[in-house]
Structures are given as C-alpha cells and as structure tokens.
A protein has these predicted regions:
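Ligand-binding "clamshell"
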Residues: 93-105, 120, 192, 197, ...
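A bilobed periplasmic-binding-protein/Venus flytrap-type ligand-binding module shared by bacterial periplasmic
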Residues: 112-123, 225-237
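Short helix-initiation/N-cap motifs at beta->coil->alpha
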Residues: 63-73, 161-188
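Short, well-ordered beta-strand elements
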Residues: 28-40, 58-64, 131-132
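C-terminal motif of bacterial Sec signal peptides marking the signal peptidase cleavage site
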Residues: 15-19
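Bacterial signal peptide processing site
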Residues: 21-23
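Periplasmic-binding protein-like
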Residues: 140-149, 247-267
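A conserved helix-loop-strand patch within extracytoplasmic ligand-binding domains
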Residues: 105-154, 253
Length: 268
C-alpha cells in the first residue's frame, strides 16, 4: 500500500509540473488571452479593447494589479500572456535586475507624470525645507527627479538622465526634503507632503484629472510612452497582431480622447 501511495504521489507531482510547463511555453491561444494591467487608465482602456476583441472571437481576461512589480513577474512565470502598464525604461531596468525574458511588442499611450499638492496651487509657492514625494522605484524615481529639474526645483548632476537618484541632486536651493514612497501609495499620502510626483494612472485612480489638478505636468511629447509586453517566446504569435490592431484602433483612440480629456495621449 505504501508503495502504491508513493507512486501515486509521484504521478500527481509530475502532472503538476507538466501543467506548469504547458502554461509557460508554446504559442498563445488565438481565442483567449490573459492580460495584466494596473488599476485605472490601463484597466479602462483594456476593457475597451476586450469589448472590441469579443466581436472577433477573442476573449480577453483582465487581471488588475495595484503596483508595478507583480505584473512582470506574473508574465515571466506564465500566469499572464500579456501585460500593459509600463514604459520601456521601467521594463528595461526591471528585467535586467531580475533576468526576465520578456519584451515589448507595441506602444500604447503616453501618460505624463504630474506634480500634485493639496497645500499649494503653484510650484513657486514651495518653501524652505518642504517635503516632496516621489516614487521609490529607480526608473519612476528618476523620471520624477527629471520633472522636478524641468520645474526649476533642483539641478541634477550632468548626464544622469533616467539613472538619476536623490544622490545626484547637485543643487537644491530650497533644501527640499525628498521622500521616496511606493508609487501607488503617494496619492494616499499627499496630504502629508507639500507636493509629490504622481504617475498618471495612480492619479486618475484616486480621482485626479491630471490636466486640471496637477500644479505642474510633463510635456505631452515626453519619451515615457507605455508599451505592451509579452514573453520573448511569444513575441511573433499571431494573436498579438489582433490585440495590437484592436488596441491601436480608431475606436480606442476615440475612447481615450473622450474618457481622459488630454490626460493620456495615444502613440499611434
């Protein structure tokens, strides 16, 4: 009896391993995709894409995340087929740090980062020693610092660009106190800060209209365009042509324009 139970257990474990292997390899289904997005604009846009896809026989299941780490992990591990939430500098940094085999296949929308405040209405109202929030992940933190520099709050060391950290601040005339926080949590902590740089998806999720509520915002032609990402092995799969065509359609462009009123800019 013991040998029979042991053999059965081995078969069970083997079947699990086989199932996992099947989930992370092979061509993506032409009838079903599981897509990871962050809550807010990326979720809303993908819901529109899913609506269009349904009419073409493609079912898109949307999994919503509230932070920036797990969508890439889940994709690499095979729990997702596609994700749509990040810009290329973030992807490049993230997959390099974690040795992930995932790649960009299309661009989506540009979501300008803004500076927000519940205490002041103009960036020039900042005072000596005020607290300034920014994302704690390397790429979005650098993006925020570059925005602060353009806004005239600081000067960064020459050449650091999207590798900038708070240690690269060369000049800080107001001796501002820079506080690094989880990007998704910054809107919740805005009342405790003089100002903060907030990614547009999280700003919209918390009820802000970036073009109206930010006190300073990136230029519309900033290079931080968002992208669709898949596993390297699936980058040429036929179903992705359908997904990209639907995403970059006139129907979706109109939806973005009407829904976000200039806070998001289509890349196509």
């Amino acid at each position: 009896m013991k040998k029979i139970i042991t053999f059965a257990l081995v078969l069970f474990v083997a079947s699990l391993l086989t199932a996992c292997a099947e989930n992370t390899s092979g061509e993506l289904s032409s009838e079903h995709l599981k897509v990871g997005v962050t809550a807010g604009p990326h979720e809303q846009i993908m819901e529109k894409v899913a609506e269009l896809a349904e009419a073409e026989g493609l079912t898109i299941d949307i999994e919503v995340f509230t932070e920036y780490v797990m969508p890439n992990i889940a994709l690499d591990e095979g729990d997702l087929d596609v994700n749509s939430f990040q810009h290329k500098p973030y992807l490049d940094n993230f997959k390099s740090d974690r040795n992930l085999d995932i790649v960009e296949v299309a661009t989506t929308v540009n979501a300008p980062m803004g500076i927000y405040s519940t205490q002041i209405s103009d960036i020039t109202e900042l005072e000596e020693g005020d607290s300034v929030g920014l994302p704690n992940d390397p790429i979005n933190g650098a993006r925020a610092l570059m925005l602060f520099e353009v806004a005239g709050l600081i000067t960064l060391e020459e050449g650091v660009a999207d590798q900038a950290t708070v240690l690269d601040i060369a000049d800080n005339p107001l001796n501002l106190d820079f506080i690094e926080l989880e990007a998704s949590q910054i809107p919740r902590q805005l009342d405790e800060l003089a100002v903060a740089a907030i990614n547009t998806n999280f700003a919209i999720e918390h009820g802000y209209v970036p073009t109206e509520d930010s006190i300073y915002i990136e230029a519309a032609d900033s290079p931080w365009v968002n992208i669709i990402v898949v596993r390297e092995e699936n980058k040429d799969d036929a179903v992705l042509e359908t997904l990209i065509r639907l995403y970059q359609s006139e129907e979706v462009a109109q939806f973005v324009e009407e829904t976000f009123q200039g806070s998001l800019i289509t890349s196509w």
